[in-house]
């Protein structure tokens, strides 16, 4: 195989690997490129490589995606092979047979590869809305914010980070694994989200402190040289939290991703941001970064209007260069930096 062909094959394999590990929509896979490769060669070796990068990947074996998803993926892979080659590939049918007999649980796993070679694995609900909340799955803006964070580790290095509406935990876990924060506080308000969030923190190898009080009592060992940040998960209801409760966190950086669902959440979020602006003992306001997908321009406009009325200046963060995670490429997303 010529060097250019090897490079093309490697890109194709990476495309399948990243999308399958993250359980992205099948329509987003590079099927057309695969069909071209299959027409130009016997294809058996390439398909076996794809199997090893997807359903046979060590991460998927240990933390499997949805059975339904694996079944659909393998069925599509077999269709592409059969459309070009009449000779069946036993390994494909064997892999499909294994998932056809498996039960599909209510939870599945998604994994995201980091530039360091490490990965973030999340256990998520198989339903977009489960237990009355959308916080049990990872949304596009969380991936977008995590990508930006990985490119800008200095924003978080050796600092205390508070994330509002952490959901499944993707953004925070990526930051904890790549940006060396001093401490990271995941927060949400829904009991099922908090339970899943704690599980994902542990799943990714972090110890979980019981509360912020343990940090206040024993901050010493968590020095900038520490390899692992101090991590906790906190229940934080934007509508009822008080300024003294927020002051206990003493954040240097505040984050939120995909939390602009409706006008009510916008008003609640701005209320929390106003309280956070005066929460630090040294009177230095934390840096704040809010990422969102532009689903409803009116809701986004309401957010910036409310920020203005609250006296919180903002600026849009320039788009980052590197796309690390697979998400909807046609989604319009933005990150605002707020001056609290």
From Swiss-Prot:
The gene is EEF2KMT. It catalyses: L-lysyl-[protein] + 3 S-adenosyl-L-methionine = N(6),N(6),N(6)-trimethyl-L-lysyl-[protein] + 3 S-adenosyl-L-homocysteine + 3 H(+). One of its GO terms (biological process) is peptidyl-lysine trimethylation. It is found in: Cytoplasm. Its EC number is 2.1.1.-. The keyword Cytoplasm applies. Keywords: Acetylation, Cytoplasm, Methyltransferase, S-adenosyl-L-methionine, Transferase. This is Protein-lysine N-methyltransferase EEF2KMT. It comes from Bos taurus. GO terms for molecular function: protein-lysine N-methyltransferase activity. Gene3D superfamilies: Vaccinia Virus protein VP39. Interacts with FAM86B2 and FAM86C1P. S-adenosyl-L-methionine binds at residues 139, 165-167, 238, 257. The keyword Transferase applies. The modification N-acetylmethionine is found at residue 1.
